[in-house]
Amino acid sequence: MIRKLLDGLYTASGVAAGLCLIVILFLIVIQMLARWTGEVFPGAPDYAGYAMAAASFLAFANALNKGSHIRVSILLNALGERARFFMEVWCFGIGTAVAWYMTYYIWVMRGYAIRFNDVSQGQDATPMHIAQAPILIGSVILAIALTDNLITLLVTGKHRIVRDVTDTQAE
C-alpha cells in the first residue's frame, strides 16, 4: 500500500516536471508571438524561470529512482559486496541528511517570503512564496525518496534505484 503510494508520488512528480517543461514551451511561443505582433507579455521570462526551477526540483525524485542521476558506479563496482553496501549506506545517509536540510531551509526561506510579502523584481511583481512552492514540494519529495531508498537498503540490503538497460553502457 505505502509502496504503491510512494511510487505514484515519484511518478506524479516526474509528470508535473514534464508539464512544467511544456509550460516553458508555451511561454516562449507566446512571447515570440507577442513580439511579432508588437505586443508585450510582461513577466514571461520570469515565469519561464519559475517553471524551470519547478521542473528541476519536481524531477529529482523520479530521476533518482530511474537511475538518471550521476552515480559513482565505477567505484561501487570495484568494491566487494560488503564494502559496497556500507558505501551505499553512507551515500544515501549523507544524501538524505542534505536533502532534509535543504528542505528545511527552503521552508524557512518561503516563510520569510510570506512574512515580508516578498515579490519578484520583474514587471509582474509575483509573490515569491508562490514561485517557491514547487521548489519546496520537489525538495520534500526528493528527501522522501532518499529516505525511502536508505530505509529499503538497510532493511533489504538493496536500494530501489533501477536503471533502464537501454540507458546503460557496456562495462
Question: What are the language-model segments listed below?
Answer:
Residues M1-E171:
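Alpha-helical transmembrane segments and membrane-interface helix-loop junctions
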